[in-house]
Design a protein with these regions (language model features):
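Vicinal oxygen chelate
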Residues: 7, 17-20, 76-120, 125
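Short, charged/polar surface micro-motifs in flexible loops or helix N-caps
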Residues: 53-55, 66-68, 82-85
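A short beta-turn/loop motif at secondary-structure boundaries
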Residues: 38-41, 66-67, 103-106
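Core segments of cupin and vicinal oxygen chelate
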Residues: 3, 14-55
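Hydrophobic adenine-recognition pocket in adenosine-nucleotide-binding enzymes
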Residues: 12, 75
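Short beta-strand micro-motifs in enzyme catalytic cores
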Residues: 44-46, 73, 109-111
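Short, charged/polar, Gly/Pro-enriched secondary-structure boundary elements
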Residues: 53-58, 118-122
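Short, flexible turn/loop "capping" segments at secondary-structure junctions
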Residues: 2-6, 66-70
Length: 125
């Protein structure tokens, strides 16, 4: 078997139920910018990024049905220090998010909270 080339993570795709609600959350709570929006086949798509050099880090597709569970365990965002974890916590509280959970893992400090469709978000250092 040949060796794999060096790879880096490119982007995450999420099947969503309510694309407007999810775009609102990811832009207003997590600081993403909506970079593009349109149709891909029969699905409405939204592209979001926090990196001005990347067209998208997340693509959302309005393809999930109301009765389908999310299959994402968690989406994790690394920050530089405890102050930035605390800022994320305070921002989530101010946004009225329920189910916020700060956790000391010993090797990392994290805050967890759900997005509007139940995907678990982690901000950690």
């Amino acid at each position: 078997m040949s060796e794999l080339p060096r790879m880096s993570f490119g982007h995450l795709g999420i099947d969503v139920i309510d694309i407007d609600q999810m775009v609102d959350f990811y832009t207003n709570v997590l600081g993403f910018k909506l970079t593009d929006r349109g149709l891909g086949g029969k699905a409405e798509l939204a592209f979001l990024s926090r990196n001005p050099e990347e067209h998208h880090q997340i693509v959302m597709a309005a393809t999930r049905k109301d009765n389908e569970r999310t299959t994402i365990n968690q989406i994790s965002f690394r920050v530089n220090d405890f102050q930035e974890v605390r800022q994320a916590y305070d921002h989530a509280v101010a946004a009225g998010i329920e189910g916020i959970e700060p956790v000391d893992h010993g090797s990392a400090l994290s805050v967890y909270f759900p997005d509007p469709e139940g995907n678990r978000i982690e901000v950690y250092m």
